[in-house]
Amino acid sequence: MANYTAADIKALRERTGAGMMDVKKALDEANGDAEKAIEIIRIKGLKGATKREGRSTAEGLVAAKVSNGVGVMIEVNCETDFVAKADKFIQLADKVLAVAVESGAADLETLLATDVDGKPLSEVVIEEGAVLGEKVVVRRISRIEGATVDAYLHKTSKDLPAQVGVLFAVDGESEAAATAAHDVAVHIAAMAPNYLTREDVPSDLVESERRIAEETAKAEGKPEAALTKIVEGRVTGFYKGEVLVDQAFAKDAKKSVAQILEEAGVKGTAFARFRVGS
């Protein structure tokens, strides 16, 4: 008897994009372990096998502000793009951002509990949502401190408020540091790294990528003697896709982000990237 349910199959299909029978076979082979099944699907190169964790169709905006070496960024969601571009919704987001900056809140729970004219911010958001006729949610907040912090907001559509936001901090305070911080913030918006350095990547994820690279190389018929080099090359490629400082710089692909920062005499210390609905 299978040790997984129809709901498990549905969830795995949504995460990988693979067909129902392929998902069932992978779950059978993995003895019901969803994460192992994802590895199997990726190794076999099944069509559409891409992760879709956290996928959402939410509309809304990202807002950010930097003050005295502290960057604060929020994402506020609504149901339709019609409301997302409405003045009242944008004003509500501005109010939420102001509360986030002034309160010093570093997490969503604290932010939503912050008193605003005698009531918690969460109630203010619900009331404003009722006026707009849609459910409105403050989805997340990020707070980053550094010697220099840059905030960059990007519009994916000229008709909507910013859909992508980035905070990026470096450890220097020079003009060169500020320029580098901004340029790299723009890069982060475009290239969407998940980690600042290789040391930030969870070891189990690296080992998973290593296993996938090895099994894929074997499935491709690569010679045993070449496997180690091939695997290391593919793991390096993984780092170049996921790790900020390893990525090719968007404005000059001949240089890495690490080189851009080094030329400015700084190191990146933290970053956050929000995209509405993802």
Curated annotation (Swiss-Prot):
**Annotated compartments:** Cytoplasm
Q: Name one GO molecular function term.
A: translation elongation factor activity
Query: Might you report a single GO cellular component term?
Result: cytoplasm
Gene3D superfamilies membership: 1.10.286.20, DNA helicase RuvA subunit, C-terminal domain, Elongation factor Ts, dimerisation domain
Keyword match Zinc: no
Detail the disulphide connectivity of this chain as listed in its UniProt entry.
none
Q: Which UniProt keywords apply?
A: Cytoplasm, Elongation factor, Protein biosynthesis
Q: Which InterPro entries match?
A: EF-Ts_dimer_sf, Transl_elong_EFTs/EF1B, Transl_elong_EFTs/EF1B_dimer, Transl_elong_Ts_CS, UBA-like_sf
Report the CDD domains cross-referenced here: UBA_EF-Ts
* Region named Involved in Mg(2+) ion dislocation from EF-Tu: 80-83
Function summary: Associates with the EF-Tu.GDP complex and induces the exchange of GDP to GTP. It remains bound to the aminoacyl-tRNA.EF-Tu.GTP complex up to the GTP hydrolysis stage on the ribosome.
Spell out the family assignment given in the record's similarity comment: Belongs to the EF-Ts family.
Q: Which PANTHER family match?
A: ELONGATION FACTOR TS (PTHR11741), ELONGATION FACTOR TS, MITOCHONDRIAL (PTHR11741:SF0)
What is the name of this protein? Elongation factor Ts
Native source species: Pseudarthrobacter chlorophenolicus (strain ATCC 700700 / DSM 12829 / CIP 107037 / JCM 12360 / KCTC 9906 / NCIMB 13794 / A6) (Arthrobacter chlorophenolicus)
